[in-house]
C-alpha cells in the first residue's frame, strides 16, 4: 500500500470523537521520505502556519535536511489522502520575492511535489467581501486568478501598463473546486465543523482563532481616514500612513490596538451592513510588494483591474510562475487606514479550514497526473 494511504508509526490515530488528532514531532524521525509528499502549503506568517498545522489530520515526524543551504523549516503531515508539507516565510520578512525563495527550497527538498497552496490572510474589497470571508484565486477573463498589480511599465501620457502573465492554478485543484462548490450548495461548508474540531484539539487556540463577539465587522466610508491617538490621550490626529506598513506591526501596540481600534474615528462614517454568515468568493486576487492601507488607492486599483478584484495581498505573485498553486485568503481587513490585527488569527483559520475542505475533493490520481514542480522549474 502506498505511503499516501497509510498512517506512519509516528502518526496519532483518530480521537474518541471521530476526528484525527495530530501529534508533536518531537519523537523519532518519520517513516516517510521526501518523495512521499505531493502537496506544498506555503504561509507568510507564523499565525497562518499555526492554523495550517491545526488542520492536519495526522502530523508526521521530521525528515532530515536534504541541503545545508535550505533555510526552511518544514511541518509534515496529511489531510485526507494527501501528504502535505508546510513552510512559512522567515519571521519579519514578507513579499513576493521572499515567498518565491521559500517555495524554491521546498520544491528542491521534496521532488514529488506537484501542486501548491498559498494560504493565509489578505485585505478584502468591499462591499462584496467582508471580514471573515474567504477568497480563492480563480481565473477571471484575461487574468489567471492572481495579478501582480505593481509589475509593469510607464507609458506615454503617464499611465501604467501591467506586463507579464502568471500561470493558472493547477487543473487538479480547479477541478476539485467545481466539485466542492456543488457539495457546499447541497449540504453547506464544513469550515465551521473544522473550526470546532480545532478548538477541541487545541483549546488554547480558541480565544483568537475562533470568531467571538469581540470581533466587529466595521467598514468606514472610503473618504474617512483613520484617526489615531497623538502625543497625548486628549489629542487625536489623522493616520497618514497609507501603503508602507506590513501585516505584522510592532508588537507593543497590539493590545491597545485590539481594544481601542478606531476609538477616535467618526462612527457616523461607518457603512451599514446587513449581518450575514461567512461567504466564500472565487475570483481575482491582486498581489504586490506593498501593503495597501488606503481606501482611495484600493478603489482605484480595483477600477483599473475592471472592478474584478476581491482581495489584495503580498506574496502570491512571487509563486504563481515557479510554483503552480491556488491562493486562499481569509479576509482580515479592508485594506484601508483602519486596518488592524484583530481579525488576523480568525481569518487565517477560515482560510486553512477551506484548504482542508478542498483537499477532500482533490483526487490523488489527478495530482499524480500533474507534472512535478521541479520539472517545470527546469523547463522555465
What are these regions (language model features)?
Residues 2-380:
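Intrinsic-disorder/coil detector with helix-boundary
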Amino acid at each position: 500500500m502506498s505511503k499516501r494511504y497509510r498512517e506512519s508509526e509516528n502518526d496519532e490515530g483518530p480521537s474518541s470523537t471521530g476526528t484525527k488528532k495530530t501529534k508533536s514531532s518531537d519523537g523519532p524521525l518519520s517513516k516517510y521520505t521526501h518523495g512521499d509528499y505531493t502537496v506544498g502549503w506555503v504561509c507568510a506568517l507564523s499565525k497562518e502556519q499555526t492554523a495550517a498545522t491545526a488542520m492536519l489530520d495526522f502530523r508526521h515526524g521530521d525528515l532530515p535536511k536534504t541541503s545545508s543551504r535550505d533555510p526552511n523549516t518544514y511541518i509534515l503531515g496529511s489531510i485526507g489522502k494527501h501528504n502535505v508539507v508546510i513552510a512559512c516565510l522567515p519571521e519579519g520578512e514578507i513579499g513576493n520575492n521572499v515567498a518565491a525563495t521559500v517555495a524554491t527550497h521546498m520544491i528542491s527538498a521534496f521532488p514529488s511535489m506537484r501542486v501548491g497552496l498559498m494560504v493565509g490572510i489578505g485585505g478584502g474589497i468591499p462591499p462584496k467581501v467582508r471580514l471573515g470571508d474567504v477568497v480563492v484565486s480563480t481565473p477571471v477573463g484575461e487574468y489567471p486568478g492572481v495579478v501582480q498589480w505593481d509589475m509593469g511599465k510607464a507609458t506615454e501620457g503617464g499611465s501604467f501598463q501591467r506586463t507579464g502573465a502568471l500561470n493558472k492554478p493547477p487543473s487538479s485543484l480547479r477541478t476539485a473546486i467545481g466539485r466542492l462548490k456543488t457539495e457546499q450548495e447541497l449540504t453547506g461548508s464544513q469550515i465551521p465543523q473544522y473550526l470546532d474540531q480545532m478548538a477541541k484539539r487545541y483549546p488554547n487556540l480558541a480565544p483568537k482563532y475562533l470568531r467571538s463577539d469581540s470581533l466587529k465587522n466595521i467598514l468606514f466610508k472610503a473618504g474617512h481616514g483613520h484617526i489615531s491617538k497623538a502625543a497625548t490621550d486628549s489629542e487625536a490626529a489623522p493616520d497618514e500612513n497609507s501603503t508602507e506598513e506590513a501585516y505584522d506591526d510592532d508588537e507593543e501596540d497590539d493590545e491597545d490596538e485590539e481594544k481601542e481600534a478606531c476609538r477616535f474615528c467618526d462612527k457616523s462614517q461607518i457603512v451599514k451592513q446587513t449581518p450575514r454568515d461567512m461567504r466564500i468568493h472565487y475570483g481575482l486576487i491582486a498581489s504586490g510588494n506593498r501593503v495597501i492601507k488606503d481606501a482611495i488607492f484600493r478603489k482605484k486599483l480595483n477600477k483599473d483591474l475592471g472592478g474584478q478584484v476581491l482581495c489584495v495581498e503580498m506574496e502570491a505573485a512571487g509563486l504563481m510562475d515557479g510554483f503552480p498553486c491556488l491562493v486562499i485568503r481569509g479576509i482580515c481587513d479592508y485594506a484601508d487606514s483602519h486596518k488592524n490585527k484583530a481579525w488576523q488569527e480568525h481569518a487565517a483559520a477560515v482560510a486553512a479550514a477551506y484548504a482542508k475542505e478542498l483537499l477532500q475533493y482533490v483526487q490523488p490520481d489527478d495530482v499524480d497526473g500533474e507534472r512535478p514542480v521541479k520539472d517545470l522549474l527546469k523547463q522555465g
